Amino acid sequence: MKISVTQYCLLILTLLAISSWGFHAHKTIHTQAIFTLPIKMSPFFLDHAHDLKERAVTADKRRYTDTTEACKHYIDLDLYGIYPFENIPRKWFNAKEVYTKDTLKSRGILPWVINWEYKNLVWAMDSGSKEDVLKHAADIGHYISDANVPLHTTSNYNGQHSNQKGIHALWESRIPENYSETYDYFVGKAQYIEDPLEFAWNIVLESNLLLNETLEQEKKVTERTRKDGKYKMDVSNGKVHSEYTSEFIAEYNFALSNMVERRLQSSINAVGSLWYSAWIDAGQPNLNLLKTKKEQPNKELILISSPNRIHE
């Protein structure tokens, strides 16, 4: 069966959409979040900046070996009704009573995972090891960053229901890869978060409010772009692959009024604030004095299992 160039491009773009926010963006977020921290805790994070940067994408890599991982990166709010989705109990145990755990897992559990990882990070800072702190700091940073992405709040996560396949990688990978060097990374100091679960829900809802604009602007840019102006064929390492043209990426970024930069900035502040808050709740320990010992797993997370999706 023959396929058109456009169909081929869409297929390749779908296969390329394999990492939330894009590895480049996640690593940038974690690195920049360190500079939001107060002087009493920043030395530890600065000493381990490279390690933390590399761990920023570990949660995405786990999706290929851990069947419980995928559902932690998103929540399909559209399957629950309309904004502000007041029919979803914000607390996990209440939500399980209404929808059952299997239903919640099938629709994504992102805000609850952020809250569980927060508790893990508090434990790690209080009585864990340096390894534990780095693991949970990286993981909670990854999840809260995913919560800042509009396409992580819908079942139409890659435009597959609106004839916009590939939009996920376009929004969260291609745009930051092309423009991150021009971004303003001054996002202020980390703030103490009283209620991490409420904080996670608020960010998810903020992201969902941007979903219509995310989809509609891509449609408009596509409509005014010539047929051969959206995709290009590239050759690298002897292999042919498709990619959005730099002109299309630029047009879409402009149409979004720098939405991607703003959500990345929000991610940086959120990551730093969660790290800082966990440190406060742990009693402001000297993290450099932590010893090495085996991590204690979070029992709640062990119980979670969900099939992988192509791109979360």
What is each residue range found by the language model?
Residues 19-135, 139, 155-265, 269-312:
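N-terminal, motif-rich segments that launch catalysis or mediate targeting to/interaction with membranes
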